[in-house]
Amino acid sequence: MAGITEHSTIMNDANFKEENAHLSDASIHFGSSEQDKTPSDYELDDVLDLYNDTTEDDADDADDVNNYIMSPSSSLSSESEHALDALVYPIYSHHNILEHENNSDYASITPSNHPAFTSCAYLQNPVVDSNNEYESKFRLSLEIPPTDFLSTSTELSKRESCLSTETSSSKFSAVTAATITNETQSEKRSSQTDPSLPFKTNSLNCDVTYEEGPLTKKLRGPKKYKPSHSSWDIYGFKKANQFYTVDQYNTWYGPYSRYLERREQRWKLFLQENGIDYIHQSPSIFPSRSAKTQRFIRKGIPPEYRGNAWFYYSGGYELLQRNPKLYETLWRCACIKKPSDSDLIERDLYRTFPDNVHFRHKSKHSRNSSDASEHSSEEPDVPMISKLRRVLMTFATYLPENGYCQSLNFLAGFFLLFMSEEKAFWMLVITCRKYLPKMHDANLEGANIDQSVLMASVRESLPAVWSRISLNFDGIPVNDIVAKLPPITLVTAAWFMSAFVGILPTETALRVWDCFFYEGSKVLFMTALCILRLGEDDIKSKSEQTEVFQVIQDLPKSLLDANAFLSLCFRRNFRRTPSQKDIERRREKVAKKRNSSASKLEMSDSSKHHLSRSSSRFSKSHIISQLHNHLKKST
């Protein structure tokens, strides 16, 4: 593909060392030591230069066949059972919530010994004063029901009448019925809730669906990869953008569609060799971790299997089995008491993939994408928007210290295309707690840490690029990348926070995700460094800082050829990236240094270039907007 070229100048791993690298460690280099490498790291050359319209890329697929299946937990490498348990937020194992008078927030959340799964929420208010006024004090308690069915009953009493809302849901669906009962009348009739109540009955829609993602079903049929002249790709996104036309996309996709068909057949043989049934249903278990599995992952997971494969290799099935019904229970809690970020969530729902056919209302297909964010309250939501709302509201309820941060909507939306909303919720939890720790917290601490690690990697691996991007808006180099991040991180932080969704073309982003959920966060660092390496010549040729920003912002959007890009990412003589162990060590080192100098940073003007949730929630809700503001000031 145009834009992806090989560079003749390769950095010398042994001799290069940045003179004043604040994160340098004599025993730790981004070019990992031999003893740190796994056997699979030595067998990756076979994915290089093999992506063409032949069967050459399949030549190595017969090696290292595993004749046994490991459980998800045993395939999590060093992930221990204790570490897996740590992903589950302990306060929600079971809780009682009390709301006191004149207090809109829960006054206390007390843990209980009962598990939260297969529980039912019961809201009651038996106390009424003599003036026929509602008391605002009520209790929400979670109790274990005798069956697998989840029943939620909400009752609010008012002297001679009470309003009750009963919701019964099975494993597959939920049906909500609201009735009002008067003790002096035998008939039941539908009614609106008194406006003084803490919530309205018609807003308590606790239905949860368990259907799989729309793409999983769509991509099972025959001729699913067949090229078409439609303006939409197989995932429902627009083919064309400002960097390539529909014709250019179709020219690339023709050979790539045959590659997808061929790889799917190789995957079916791979699953069959491991005793996994793929004929009657999409597999929920996959081959154990090995050099061969890694090669298959890096060559791309078939779209039909993609959601289940992500869920399996990330440990999602373990969490789901240990916490059945937790998602549904938390959603019901969110119905009763909306999380503090609910307004932000509602605002971003209709900005999530407005050009994707699965997220757009049918009446809007002929409108401009800018109109997609405008939504009428009278117009019913499309199913994907309703699912996205439930996932994000439940996530904000489950992790209140994390809450909601813009870019989580794109992560959740991508998950929902390939899996059920319950699995999408757990994948969002795993991503934020395991793969990108503290990345989306209120102060974006994880984003700052990872950007420090990335900048250190650029400084060591790409000194020519570093000399151009290390300048602040005044043209002064940034030396201490822990105390003060270069302004360019306003761009690269968005890469990490979205895991390249909306940054790279759809197919390329999906291929990065295949590797990301199998190998860990090191894949994001490899991807970022590869992008900067590809644009090194353009970056060095720009004299103005604003031009450098524009080049880096536009670089990933043109990387349509997923095969060519992934092959370069994993090419040994093209990259100098850290191993996962190196990343964890450097994250820990940066975190310690940031903690030790936190008080100084608060008193220093240098902290203005550190990322924070407050600085990222502004006009258009995108971190790139802040970059544009800086660029305007500098011109």
UniProtKB/Swiss-Prot annotation:
<dbReference type="GO" id="GO:0005886">
    <property type="term" value="C:plasma membrane"/>
</dbReference>
<feature type="transmembrane region" description="Helical">
    <location>
        <begin position="485"/>
        <end position="505"/>
    </location>
</feature>
<dbReference type="GO" id="GO:0030036">
    <property type="term" value="P:actin cytoskeleton organization"/>
</dbReference>
<feature type="modified residue" description="Phosphoserine">
    <location>
        <position position="191"/>
    </location>
</feature>
<feature type="modified residue" description="Phosphothreonine">
    <location>
        <position position="193"/>
    </location>
</feature>
<dbReference type="InterPro" id="IPR050302">
    <property type="entry name" value="Rab_GAP_TBC_domain"/>
</dbReference>
<feature type="domain" description="Rab-GAP TBC">
    <location>
        <begin position="300"/>
        <end position="520"/>
    </location>
</feature>
<feature type="transmembrane region" description="Helical">
    <location>
        <begin position="512"/>
        <end position="532"/>
    </location>
</feature>
<dbReference type="InterPro" id="IPR035969">
    <property type="entry name" value="Rab-GAP_TBC_sf"/>
</dbReference>
<dbReference type="GO" id="GO:0005829">
    <property type="term" value="C:cytosol"/>
</dbReference>
<dbReference type="Pfam" id="PF00566">
    <property type="entry name" value="RabGAP-TBC"/>
</dbReference>
<dbReference type="InterPro" id="IPR000195">
    <property type="entry name" value="Rab-GAP-TBC_dom"/>
</dbReference>
<keyword id="KW-0812">Transmembrane</keyword>
<feature type="region of interest" description="Disordered">
    <location>
        <begin position="581"/>
        <end position="621"/>
    </location>
</feature>
<keyword id="KW-0472">Membrane</keyword>
<keyword id="KW-0343">GTPase activation</keyword>
<dbReference type="GO" id="GO:0006887">
    <property type="term" value="P:exocytosis"/>
</dbReference>
<keyword id="KW-0963">Cytoplasm</keyword>
<comment type="function">
    <text>Regulates exocytosis by functioning as a GAP for ypt2.</text>
</comment>
<protein>
    <recommendedName>
        <fullName>GTPase-activating protein gyp3</fullName>
    </recommendedName>
</protein>
<dbReference type="GO" id="GO:0005096">
    <property type="term" value="F:GTPase activator activity"/>
</dbReference>
<feature type="transmembrane region" description="Helical">
    <location>
        <begin position="410"/>
        <end position="430"/>
    </location>
</feature>
<dbReference type="GO" id="GO:0005737">
    <property type="term" value="C:cytoplasm"/>
</dbReference>
<feature type="region of interest" description="Disordered">
    <location>
        <begin position="361"/>
        <end position="381"/>
    </location>
</feature>
<keyword id="KW-0597">Phosphoprotein</keyword>
<keyword id="KW-1133">Transmembrane helix</keyword>
